[in-house]
Design a protein with these regions (language model features):
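Glycine-rich segments within core transmembrane alpha-helices of 12-TM secondary carriers
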Residues: 159-178, 184, 306, 394-404
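Helix-loop-helix hairpin linking two adjacent transmembrane segments in secondary transporters
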Residues: 165-218
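Cytoplasmic helix-loop-helix junction between adjacent transmembrane helices
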Residues: 130-170
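Cytoplasmic membrane-interface "Motif A"-like loop-to-helix N-cap segments
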Residues: 79-90, 319-333
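C-terminal transmembrane helical hairpin of 12-TM major facilitator-type secondary transporters
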Residues: 323-373
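C-terminal ends and interior cores of transmembrane alpha-helices
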Residues: 91-120, 334-348
Length: 451
């Protein structure tokens, strides 16, 4: 760091790297206990007789509660210790997954074993409660990360380094679909419960590691704050009052038209992303004739391509567009629509490499905006409100599960997968048009704060 002496700079870089790696691993594990559901769905449908519409309702309720939780926890995380917040939240998510896996046993114990209507209803109700609870607890994952990263990474480096960090989404989702794909391939439809038990055990262990590895801010380890990022807002050593904080949030988040545009765009980005991620195994097996194990691998490759897309989009944003992440998103959404169209047009007997290439190209494109929206929101709101801004955009993002969850499930069940593909393409185009609305916006809101 330019403003620090050599020893301080060395210590700062060590803690910066440690924070990035620890939060990457931690957030990947949040996906272990969230995206395991998509691979368990076909088994639950076969083994338990749960309909696609009901499974889609689980996804929708989980997503809505998660989006609301991210918003609430975003406001809280800006003013609390991120280390405790993230570690405890991950541990509780793991416990909720353990409980979900025991749903059949719980309903059988309470109402007697069998396949009666009452037991089925009780089991579905218990599953729904546990998955909604998990959705709420998942909201303790990203907000503390947004706080940590904006305190440890300078704004001019944020797009590149946070794009690297954002690969945790794809690493976590990719690894868990491979793991659960293997479980379902090995145990068959009845193995769905192990898709919850095994990821939960891994995540609980990870929560302990997070608690040991993380620290909240540079000052908590005796290091200076990054200059030029509003660190001076605690003037004369006085703590910011609640009224001052609320006024700042109104101006930089809730009354900021750029944050609203990013939030609305996030709604469309997440519909496309979750349509593939949540329904991918079912869609690929039913519309393209792949086995569940191979479908799991293809969804994992979609995630891996997303990693490359995030890294490239972050690098291109800083290198060519001077940090204007919203401009990169325009091109990414156009590419997403194009490659989903190509994938849709491939026949069920098409070579696997063609299916691979087109779906991976779509993943490469859609994960650029998924990563960059958080970066753009953090920069526009400044680090004082980074978690709140990301919670707000996340609220819109996970409201998208109304469409990608129960909406897409009902559309596929009643009209077929062809209509679902058309919906995804149209939504990607709308998302591109929303991003175009802020084409001329500046890269961040720090300059405005210093005027």
């Amino acid at each position: 760091m330019e403003h620090m002496d050599q020893d301080t700079s060395k210590r700062f870089k060590y803690w910066q790297t440690r924070t990035i790696i620890a939060t990457m691993v931690g957030y990947a594990l949040f996906y272990f206990v969230r995206k395991n559901f998509s691979l368990a769905m076909p088994g639950m449908e076969t083994d338990l007789g749960i309909t696609k519409t009901s499974l889609g309702l689980f996804l929708t309720l989980n997503g809505l509660v998660y989006g609301l939780s991210r918003f609430v926890n975003g406001i809280l995380a800006d003013r609390m210790n991120a280390r405790y917040y993230m570690a405890i939240g991950l541990a509780l998510c793991a416990l909720a997954n353990f409980a979900f896996g025991f749903a059949e046993s719980v309903s059988g114990t309470l109402l007697g074993w069998g396949i009666g209507k009452n037991q089925m209803q009780a089991m579905i109700l218990f599953m729904g409660v546990m998955w909604v609870l998990n959705g709420f607890l998942q909201g303790t994952g990203f907000p503390p990360c947004a706080r940590l990263l904006t305190h440890w990474i300078p704004p001019k480096e944020l797009a590149t380094k946070m794009s690297v960090w954002n690969t945790s989404h794809s690493i976590g989702a990719g690894l868990v679909v491979i793991l659960c794909g293997y479980i379902m391939g090995h145990y068959g439809a009845g193995g769905w419960k192990y898709c919850f038990f095994i990821p939960a055990a891994i995540s609980f262990a990870g929560a302990i590691v997070l608690f040991i590895a993380l620290r909240d801010t540079p000052t908590s380890v005796g290091l200076p704050e990054i200059p030029g990022t509003g660190a001076e807002y605690k003037k004369d050593g006085k703590k910011e009052t609640s009224a001052e904080n609320k006024a700042f949030l109104r101006r930089k988040v809730f009354g900021n038209p750029l944050i609203w545009i990013l939030a609305i765009a996030n709604f469309f980005v997440y519909i496309v992303r979750f349509s593939v991620l949540d329904w991918g195994p079912t869609l690929l097996s039913q519309s393209k004739g792949l086995s569940l194990e191979n479908a799991g691998w293809l969804v994992a490759l979609f995630e891996i391509s997303g990693i490359l897309g995030m890294l490239f989009s972050g690098w291109a944003t800083d290198k060519f567009l001077k940090g204007r992440a919203h401009r990169t998103c325009v091109f990414c959404m156009l590419g997403s629509a194009l490659f989903i169209f190509i994938f849709w047009q491939l026949p069920s007997g098409a070579p696997v490499w063609l299916l691979f290439a087109s779906l991976c190209a779509a993943g490469f494109c859609i994960y650029g905006p998924q990563a960059l929206i958080g970066i753009a929101a953090a920069n526009q709101a400044t680090k004082r409100a980074a978690a709140t801004a990301n919670g707000f955009t996340g609220l819109f993002g996970y409201a998208s599960t109304i469409v990608s969850g129960v909406g897409l499930g009902a559309l596929a069940q009643h009209c077929g997968w062809g209509y679902a593909y058309v919906a995804m393409i149209g939504i990607a185009v709308i998302g591109m048009l929303v991003f175009l609305m802020m084409w001329n916006a500046k890269a961040d809101g720090y300059e405005e704060e210093q005027v």
